[in-house]
């Protein structure tokens, strides 16, 4: 996996050699303190086949991140049945949309929504 961290956002990208599932999530959690104060994007687009369970694995981390840091957590994924995803989990099809989602959520936080 690669970590691309700037002043507002950490983009964590899956690479083909990564083991998806718990090992992937565990590595993110292990490094979490280094980007816990930032918006987080998990980019799974390089993954050939994204399953519901791969997305669902991030539910707890996403919820905790939003509550504790008051920052955004967005997952970028290829085709997946959005109706099956837990409420409150942001999943979008492109990195551009992930960045747009973060921008909108930052505006909402600034306005007190």
Language model segments and positions:
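Amphipathic, Lys/Arg-enriched alpha-helical "gate/interface" segment within cytosolic domains
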Residues: 2-113
């Amino acid at each position: 996996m690669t970590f691309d961290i700037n002043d507002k956002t950490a983009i964590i990208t899956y690479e083909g050699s990564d083991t998806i599932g718990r090992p992937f999530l565990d590595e993110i959690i292990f490094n979490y303190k280094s980007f816990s104060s930032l918006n987080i994007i998990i980019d799974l687009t390089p993954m050939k086949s994204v399953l519901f369970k791969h997305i669902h694995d991030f539910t707890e981390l996403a919820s905790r991140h939003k509550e504790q840091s008051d920052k955004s957590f967005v997952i970028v994924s290829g085709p997946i049945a959005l109706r099956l995803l837990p409420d409150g989990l942001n999943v979008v099809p492109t990195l551009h949309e992930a960045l747009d989602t973060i921008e909108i959520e930052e505006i909402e936080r600034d306005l007190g929504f």
